[in-house]
């Protein structure tokens, strides 16, 4: 590609999916520019690496670019997209650019409705501990690397494969992971769950004859498609027919302790520095891949025991002062689908048994809130206290029957928790100050702007201290 394309421009360069690819391309020696609506830590990092970042979208920003990269979040009437069309500069979907990177190395693509970011991070960490020095592109900040992407010298690139817009079908990896299949982003698939499952089957058809599909056999929808996968399959999970299986699972001190059974191998005792059964499954995917690539068991154990997590995935902010004295534990999580939320709540209950659980939740997208309305009511009813904000629209038009007020009314009718409704995220800190008590576990949760709340709480605490 480099003999033709020298300068690559990213529209929305500060986004989690775009910034990682941009960083790898900078490190490969490409001239990279980009634009976004606001400056953040990610754009500042890219600028420090040599990328040119413009704040605001303007046709002039793409000057000199040989290609313009866009995600599905970028509107077709964006001035930079219109300028690229007018100048006949190729407009490249994000997934297609990721596919180009995968052509340079052997790709390991992590797919599934939930758990992609954590699983991708675990795979990258285990391979790095095994000396394979992988390139990785992750949808969240890997704490140990201080970034969501890195150009390694090894043969492998580990990346998330996004099913939300079916763009994962652009990828041709040599190893694939399918963590689970659940009803989300159903607009892409015409609200037809069979079409969604078929897309995952087609994803496995991108594998070469020597490739493998590493699948979580605990998930009933994944189990249904396994007979339809024509390439070699490695099953992981808790089920009896898993080829990489966890047993003797125990939660202790915020960590998961378990033993891994693999065909033809000695039992492997593992301590995972993450809470929750869902994270044990994510770790099993990494163990399955590492075993296949002959990573030493000691390296696997070390990487999982020392795993420092990913930004906004059960990210611990420490102890915050409660208004009545004492302190509460603050955690932030990206969960925005009822299944993910239930897993995080269960992990918190396991990590902090007997403690009161307070959740501040910002729903993400009106369509998701509409499609999963009853499931949201059910999962939100399992916490001890709740702050609920208006829906983060993510560009969608409001739906009056699926907004924050409608969800609040349904929760009150269910009668298990009394939600404190706030119209904006800016009101969350004050609401939590009134609600949180000493000894509580407080989780801020959602895929929208609520991600800025825990940092503000921590900063305010630091300034007062």
Swiss-Prot record:
Its main location: cytoplasm. It is an enzyme of class 6 (ligase). GO terms for molecular function: ATP binding; UDP-N-acetylmuramate-L-alanine ligase activity. ATP binds at residues 112-118. InterPro entries: Mur-like_cat_sf (IPR036565), Mur_ligase_C (IPR004101), Mur_ligase_C_dom_sf (IPR036615), Mur_ligase_cen (IPR013221), Mur_ligase_N (IPR000713), MurCDEF_pg_biosynth (IPR050061), UDP-N-AcMur_Ala_ligase_MurC (IPR005758). It catalyses: UDP-N-acetyl-alpha-D-muramate + L-alanine + ATP = UDP-N-acetyl-alpha-D-muramoyl-L-alanine + ADP + phosphate + H(+). Its EC number is 6.3.2.8. Pfam families: Mur_ligase, Mur_ligase_C, Mur_ligase_M. Keywords: ATP-binding, Cell cycle, Cell division, Cell shape, Cell wall biogenesis/degradation, Cytoplasm, Ligase, Nucleotide-binding, Peptidoglycan synthesis. Pathway: Cell wall biogenesis; peptidoglycan biosynthesis. GO terms for cellular component: cytoplasm. It comes from the Bacteria. It is found in: Cytoplasm. SUPFAM superfamilies: MurCD N-terminal domain (SSF51984), MurD-like peptide ligases, catalytic domain (SSF53623), MurD-like peptide ligases, peptide-binding domain (SSF53244). GO terms for biological process: cell division; cell wall organization; peptidoglycan biosynthetic process; regulation of cell shape. PANTHER family: UDP-N-ACETYLMURAMATE--L-ALANINE LIGASE (PTHR43445:SF3), UDP-N-ACETYLMURAMATE--L-ALANINE LIGASE-RELATED (PTHR43445). Belongs to the MurCDEF family. NCBIfam families: murC. Cell wall formation. This is UDP-N-acetylmuramate--L-alanine ligase. It comes from Burkholderia thailandensis (strain ATCC 700388 / DSM 13276 / CCUG 48851 / CIP 106301 / E264). The lineage of its organism: Bacteria, Pseudomonadati, Pseudomonadota, Betaproteobacteria, Burkholderiales.
């Amino acid at each position: 590609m480099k003999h033709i394309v020298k300068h690559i421009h990213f529209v929305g360069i500060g986004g989690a999916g775009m910034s990682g690819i941009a960083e790898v391309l900078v490190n490969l020696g490409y001239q990279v520019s980009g634009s976004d609506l606001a400056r953040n830590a990610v754009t500042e990092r890219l600028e420090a690496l040599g990328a040119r970042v413009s704040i605001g979208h303007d046709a002039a920003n793409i000057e000199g670019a040989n290609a313009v990269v866009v995600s599905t979040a970028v509107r077709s009437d964006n001035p930079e997209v219109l300028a690229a069309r007018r100048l006949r500069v190729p407009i490249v979907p994000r997934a297609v650019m990721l596919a180009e990177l995968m052509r340079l190395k052997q790709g390991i693509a992590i797919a599934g409705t939930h758990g992609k970011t954590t699983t991708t991070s675990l795979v990258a960490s285990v391979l790095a501990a095994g000396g394979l020095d992988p390139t990785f592109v992750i949808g969240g900040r890997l704490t140990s690397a201080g970034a969501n992407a890195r150009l390694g010298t090894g043969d492998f690139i580990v990346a998330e494969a996004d099913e939300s817009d079916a763009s994962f079908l652009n990828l041709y990896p040599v190893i694939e992971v399918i963590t689970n299949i659940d009803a989300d982003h159903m607009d892409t698939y015409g609200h037809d769950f069979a079409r969604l499952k078929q897309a995952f089957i087609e994803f496995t058809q991108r594998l070469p004859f020597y490739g493998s599909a590493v699948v979580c056999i605990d998930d009933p929808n994944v189990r249904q498609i396994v007979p339809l996968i024509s390439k070699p399959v490695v099953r992981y999970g808790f089920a009896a027919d898993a080829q990489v299986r966890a047993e003797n699972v125990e939660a202790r001190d915020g960590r998961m302790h378990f033993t891994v059974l693999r065909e033809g191998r000695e039992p492997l005792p593992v301590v995972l520095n993450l809470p929750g059964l869902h994270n044990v499954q994510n770790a099993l995917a990494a163990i399955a891949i590492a075993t296949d690539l002959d990573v030493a068991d000691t390296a696997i154990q070390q990487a999982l025991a020392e795993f420092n997590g990913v930004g906004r995935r059960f990210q611990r902010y420490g102890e915050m002062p409660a208004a009545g004295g004492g302190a509460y534990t603050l955690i932030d999580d990206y969960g925005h689908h009822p299944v993910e939320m239930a897993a995080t709540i269960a992990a918190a209950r396991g990590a902090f048994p007997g403690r009161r659980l307070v959740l501040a939740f910002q729903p993400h997208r009106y369509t998701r809130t509409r499609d999963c309305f009853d499931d949201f009511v059910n999962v939100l009813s399992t916490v001890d206290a709740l702050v609920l904000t208006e829906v983060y629209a993510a560009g969608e038009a409001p739906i009056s029957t699926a907004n924050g007020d409608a969800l609040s009314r349904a929760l009150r009718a269910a009668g298990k928790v009394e939600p404190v409704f706030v119209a904006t995220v800016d009101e969350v800190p004050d609401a939590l100050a009134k609600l949180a008590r000493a000894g509580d576990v407080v989780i801020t949760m959602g895929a929208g702007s609520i991600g800025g709340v825990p940092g503000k709480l921590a900063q305010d605490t630091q300034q007062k201290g």
